[in-house]
């Protein structure tokens, strides 16, 4: 075979090989494009041009963000319905998704210490918003370990020091301050032409809060100074707003000892308490035992209901009926 013939054969083989490679590569090219499109998130947890993704710890905060931002953002709730936020552990998928988000909100509910997400500027990593910023916080209990401020060189036990009560969403007055901080962060996150929408929504939401605060103030005014008994101490800010006092059965995120239960029961009998309030996320055994010992009953109030305004009314009505 001549050199020219060899060249023709080689050219023909190259031609067939090229066609084969191109044909086989087409599906992978499309797959690659699809993968690239799905991964084209600008580091923000959502595809380019879509809504910014915001993670909030519990559904009441979802309600606030929806009221202020409307449909400008995509809101994800970390702790699901029926779960206890104090002991919740996010799934691996949730942690991956949070790392891709635009904004990650923390409420110092305890479970935030169960994961780590590298923060950023909203593009290379999520912005952070501490939902307790600018608030006049009440002292909490050792079931909320996310805000300890102890000296790492100090060997003493400080389990009960410098802890904040995180249940701030159950107070209209603290919600107003929170709403301002949320609106400020949303303006940082969203385009400038969204500011007027945020301002209008914020004004309307604060009006709703002001109205419910006035309504509940009138409802509970005759009961000023009275006590109500709860299993979990989630209602201190609510009590503060309306000059009430909550008495918690749970001590340091644990059921009371028999001795402690006896002391609480004795106090409840003296104060003629007939209702022990429980929330569905917690074991109710101790509360039911206490209720039986005082010839009372348990009643449910759920601090984690999404619609804060409606829930505040329900909580107030339930407490009012027990006083």
Where are these regions (language model features)?
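N-terminal secretory signal peptides that target proteins for export/translocation
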Residues: 1-15
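Extracytoplasmic metal-acquisition and chelation regions
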Residues: 3, 33-323
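Bacterial N-terminal signal peptides
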Residues: 12, 16-30
């Amino acid at each position: 075979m001549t050199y020219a013939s060899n060249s023709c054969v080689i050219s023909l083989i190259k031609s067939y090989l090229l066609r084969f490679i191109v044909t086989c590569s087409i599906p992978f090219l499309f797959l690659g494009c699809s993968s690239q499109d799905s991964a084209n998130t600008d580091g923000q947890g959502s595809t380019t041009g879509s809504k910014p993704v915001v993670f909030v710890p519990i559904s009441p905060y979802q309600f606030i963000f929806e009221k202020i931002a409307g449909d400008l953002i995509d809101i994800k709730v970390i702790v699901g319905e029926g779960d206890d936020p104090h002991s919740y552990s996010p799934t691996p998928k949730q942690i991956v998704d949070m790392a891709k988000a635009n904004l990650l909100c923390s409420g110092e509910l305890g479970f935030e210490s169960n994961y780590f997400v590298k923060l950023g500027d909203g593009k290379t990593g999520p912005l952070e918003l501490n939902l307790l910023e600018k608030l006049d916080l009440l002292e909490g209990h050792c079931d909320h370990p996310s805000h300890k401020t102890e000296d790492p060189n100090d060997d003493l036990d400080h389990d009960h020091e410098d802890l904040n009560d995180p249940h701030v969403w159950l107070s209209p007055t603290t919600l107003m301050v929170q709403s301002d901080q949320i609106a400020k962060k949303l303006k940082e996150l969203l385009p400038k032409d969204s500011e007027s929408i945020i301002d209008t929504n914020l004004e309307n939401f604060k009006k709703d809060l002001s109205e419910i605060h006035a309504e509940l103030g009138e409802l509970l005014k005759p009961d000023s100074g009275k006590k109500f008994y709860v299993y979990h101490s989630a209602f201190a800010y609510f009590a503060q707003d309306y000059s009430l006092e909550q008495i918690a059965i749970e001590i340091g995120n644990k059921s009371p000892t028999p001795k402690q239960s006896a002391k609480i029961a004795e106090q409840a009998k003296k104060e003629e308490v007939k209702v022990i309030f429980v929330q569905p996320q917690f074991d109710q055994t101790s509360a039911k035992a206490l209720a039986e010992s005082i010839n009372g009953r348990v009643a449910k109030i759920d601090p984690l209901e999404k619609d804060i305004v409606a829930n505040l009314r329900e909580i107030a009505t339930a407490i009012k009926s027990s006083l």
